[in-house]
Amino acid sequence: MAEKKQWHETLHDQFGQYFAVDNVLYHEKTDHQDLIIFENAAFGRVMALDGVVQTTERDEFIYHEMMTHVPLLAHGHAKHVLIIGGGDGAMLREVTRHKNVESITMVEIDAGVVSFCRQYLPNHNAGSYDDPRFKLVIDDGVNFVNQTSQTFDVIISDCTDPIGPGESLFTSAFYEGCKRCLNPGGIFVAQNGVCFLQQEEAIDSHRKLSHYFSDVGFYQAAIPTYYGGIMTFAWATDNDALRHLSTEIIQARFLASGLKCRYYNPAIHTAAFALPQYLQDALASQPS
């Protein structure tokens, strides 16, 4: 039997992970990034950008449920949601499940990502691009949040790692723009890497966000594709009560929403804000 082709991730220099490639569905360099989608027997369809895995069919639900339902249920009455990035459509899919949300704006820098994900990752978007509340804007995320006249209750930054095009979504200019277009009491969340391997990323985000928001923290989830431990999500708001809501309050909102999830539940919601001591110590050691 012929040996299967392997695809190796290049995020770290000294170690990494690989996937057996059963079939390459798409591989092309766009104006902004090198994209590949291939099939793997264990993880289904896998999408990678610039040598780094972004999403797989097998475990994407963990990431997307935690990035959407945690801020939306903590907020309690979000009407207008902004997604930065998220071209695969799975973040949009989860937001559309909240029937009280009135508008969903998604800003994606690369129109090519949206078009090929609609074709090659249909399970990710599950038809959500056709939701009448949805509006797609092709623009740079930093430019959008600093120029738009719209305001939002929840902003979700579905950013790549802070390299290449994704680097700008970890800058003070981006965070300041998000604060600018966030309604009072609104919540900003962002992907912030696997903290055991990318601790400096979390520290840097915490320091920058603290200039614009009075309550900055992280919550976490374990996602197999993003190897190396727990993945952290940045959390920023000016309402510190939202991070400390009881499980009973979240439970009531969850039941009222009618959501059926595969990973998220109210107990996971409140527990996710408990962080490992090494991350707490690293954040506490930073100058104020």
Swiss-Prot record:
Pathway assignment: Amine and polyamine biosynthesis; spermidine biosynthesis; spermidine from putrescine: step 1/1
UniProt keyword list: Cytoplasm, Polyamine biosynthesis, Spermidine biosynthesis, Transferase
GO cellular component terms, A-Z: cytosol
Residue positions binding spermidine: H64, D88, D158, C159, T160, D161
pH dependence: Optimum pH is 7.5.
Pfam families linked to this entry: Spermine_synt_N, Spermine_synth
Effect of C159A: Reduction of 23% of the aminopropyltransferase activity
Catalytic activity: S-adenosyl 3-(methylsulfanyl)propylamine + putrescine = S-methyl-5'-thioadenosine + spermidine + H(+); S-adenosyl 3-(methylsulfanyl)propylamine + spermidine = spermine + S-methyl-5'-thioadenosine + H(+); cadaverine + S-adenosyl 3-(methylsulfanyl)propylamine = aminopropylcadaverine + S-methyl-5'-thioadenosine + H(+); S-adenosyl 3-(methylsulfanyl)propylamine + spermidine = thermospermine + S-methyl-5'-thioadenosine + H(+)
Effect after changing T160A: Reduction of aminopropyltransferase activity
Known EC number: 2.5.1.-, 2.5.1.79, 2.5.1.16, 2.5.1.22
Binding residue positions for S-methyl-5'-thioadenosine: Q33, E108, D140, G141, P165
InterPro entries: PABS, PABS_CS, SAM-dependent_MTases_sf, Spermi_synthase, Spermidine_synt_N, Spermidine_synt_N_sf
SUBUNIT field: Homodimer.
Record NCBIfam families: MFS_SpdSyn (NF037959), PRK00811.1 (NF002010), speE (TIGR00417)
Role noted for this protein: Involved in the biosynthesis of polyamines which play a significant role in the structural and functional organization in the chromoid of E.coli by compacting DNA and neutralizing negative charges. Catalyzes the irreversible transfer (ping-pong mechanism) of a propylamine group from the amino donor S-adenosylmethioninamine (decarboxy-AdoMet) to putrescine (1,4-diaminobutane) to yield spermidine. Cadaverine (1,5-diaminopentane) and spermidine can also be used as the propylamine acceptor.
Full protein name: Polyamine aminopropyltransferase
